[in-house]
Every structure is written in C-alpha cells, then in structure tokens.
Amino acid sequence: MLVLGVESTAHTFSLGLVLDGKILGQLGKTYLPPSGEGIHPREAADHHSKVAPVIFRQLLNAHGITASDIDVIAYAAGPGLGPALRIGAVFARALAIKLGVPLVPVHHGIAHIEVARYTTASCDPLVLLISGGHTLIAGFSEGRYRIFGETLDVAIGNAIDMFAREVGLGFPGVPAVEKCAESADRLVPFPMTIIGQDLSYAGLTTYALKLWKSGTPLPVVCKSLVEAAYYMLAEVTERALAFTKKRELVVAGGVARSKRLRGILEHVGREYGVAVKIVPDEYAGDNGAMIALTGYYAYRRGIRTTPEESFVKQRWRLDSVDIPWFYDLCEEVVLNTSTKRRP
C-alpha cells in the first residue's frame, strides 16, 4: 500500500511517501516571511498553492512512480493556520477525487510523535513534543495520548522565534539564538513560570526583550533565554518521568534539533535510568513523511473519509484523538529490533 502524505499546517508545504509502513522519502519547500516579520497565513497559503504541483511531480519522479500508484492520501487536518491548512486539504481532496482513492485526516502533532516513535524504535515512551506550535509532555493511556503538561500560552519554538525576530536574528529563531548564545560570557537570572506541570513562555520572551532594550549584551540575553526555556522543560519532564515510570523518553518536533537541549535531556535520562531517544533531524520539522506514516497506520485501523466529508481544524487538541493503531507500531518496533539483533 502506497500512501501519500500532505503537510501544510504552517510555513512548510511537504509531501511524503510511505510504502507498506516504510518511509520512501519526502520533499518540501518552506515559506520565508519578510525579514523582521512573522508568518502571514494568507501569504503562506499562496506559497503552498504555487509549490504544491511542482513538489508533487518532483517527488513522484524521484521515486519512479506515477500518480496512479497511490492507494491512499493522508493530509494534515490540523491544528495549524487556517489558510495554509485549507490549501493542503484542497490539494488532497482534488487528488483523491481524480485518483478515486480514500482520504485519511491526520493530527499534525500526533504525526510528529509517530514518526519519532518509528525512527527511534520506541514503543511506549514518555513524549516531549516541542516545536513552533507545540510544547507538551504526553504518554499513551487508555486509547489516547494523555497530556502530563503543556504550555499555557505560546509554544517554546514560537517564543524563541518571536525574540529572534524582534532583535534581528532572523528565522528560524532557535538555531539563530543558540548561535548568538555561544559568545556569551555569563548568564543572568530569568523568571521561569511553571504552574504544576504547565509552562508559560510568553513572559520569558517579554523579559528577554526588556533586558536587551536595557543594554544587556545580546549574546548574554540569548544564552540566558535558552537556558531558562530548556530547564523549564527539563523540570516538568523529570516530574512526568517520576509519575509515569516510563523507561523511554522520546523527543519530537523541530526544537528537538537543539544540541543544547539534547544535552540537558540526556542528563535527565542518566539521572532516571531512562533511554533518551531524539527524532532524526530530517524528520524533526514539519514533513510529509510523518503525515503519510501516521495515515498508513490509521488507514489500516479503518480511519478514512471522503472528499465531501473531509475537514480541517485550526484548533485540535492532541488528547481528543483516538489512537487505535498505537500497538501496531509497537509490534513493528519489536519486529525490526529483533531482526537487527539476529546474527
């Protein structure tokens, strides 16, 4: 079964292919907003509509397949930017009608988790999902991912991106801020807001800008900002590990590329005797492969829709989605691991 995945939730339009549960490849292009500005949803949508047919042709040609080979189309139905989501959905619907194949709506955040589980050979981990649009800790229980802590306002990636934009470091903000932080000679105290297991990052950005405008050297502000942001994550992750007793920690989402954060989380893993597994860089950001992979498992469990009944949801909580395929992926992990261990 060949599944095409369509990702268009924010600044990236990407298509991915999965054949019988194996990722074949992906291809995408990212909308870059004007310098000093955030994402303009309608401009991102215009970008996606222009690049979609080009990426589709290039992806098929790269793998020597034709459109008629596609059996299922999975698309990111949310959460995300409304105009951008609709472009991906329209593309998926039109192609499904033309090819006469079913559609599978996929939750973008769950797709991040599933591709991380798949690529790190993890079965039942505690998950830290961190990106421009997500900051949460989750674990599987009773048919769904249950959230053990999340941001109360903006996601960590968005918070750092906003700071980077305001101080002229460009987009994406996380690598730019971390690069700037390398030349810092000290740290300054930052307020860290943790309420129970939940986090607040909006105030962190505001405080960082206040420090910078008051004359604190930019590298010092950058270093202090990322250290505070990451140690907030580490604290709530430690608590969740202690509560859930999970033996694996999987880190998913674009911010998982951060080498500094990896070091902090690996230290947490050593303290708790937990294996820390981080999604490979190529699947950390938004990508069509994660949509295709999740769509593949969902379709096998009977989840599908028609073009007429397909939908998009700008706001869609991760813990509202049933995951009937959860242990199917576990079986795949066990099979692959045991195969690799054979002499």
Swiss-Prot record:
Q: Which UniProt keywords apply?
A: Acyltransferase, Cytoplasm, Iron, Metal-binding, Transferase, tRNA processing
Q: Which cofactor does it need?
A: Fe(2+)
| PROSITE patterns assigned | GLYCOPROTEASE (PS01016)
Its Gene Ontology cellular component terms are: cytoplasm; EKC/KEOPS complex
Catalytic function, reaction form:
L-threonylcarbamoyladenylate + adenosine(37) in tRNA = N(6)-L-threonylcarbamoyladenosine(37) in tRNA + AMP + H(+)
- Into which EC class is this enzyme placed? transferase
Q: One MF term in GO for this entry?
A: iron ion binding
Any one of the GO BP annotations: tRNA threonylcarbamoyladenosine modification
Q: Where in the cell is it found?
A: Cytoplasm
Q: How is the cofactor bound?
A: Binds 1 Fe(2+) ion per subunit.
Question: EC no.?
Answer: 2.3.1.234
Q: Per UniProt, where does Fe cation bind?
A: H108, H112, D286
Disulfide bonds, paired cysteine numbers: none
Q: Where does substrate bind?
A: L129, I130, S131, G132, G133, D161, E178, S258
Q: What does this protein do?
A: Required for the formation of a threonylcarbamoyl group on adenosine at position 37 (t(6)A37) in tRNAs that read codons beginning with adenine. Is probably involved in the transfer of the threonylcarbamoyl moiety of threonylcarbamoyl-AMP (TC-AMP) to the N6 group of A37.
Family per record: Belongs to the KAE1 / TsaD family.
Protein's name according to its UniProt entry = tRNA N6-adenosine threonylcarbamoyltransferase
Q: Which organism is it from?
A: Pyrobaculum aerophilum (strain ATCC 51768 / DSM 7523 / JCM 9630 / CIP 104966 / NBRC 100827 / IM2)
Gene symbol of the encoding locus: kae1
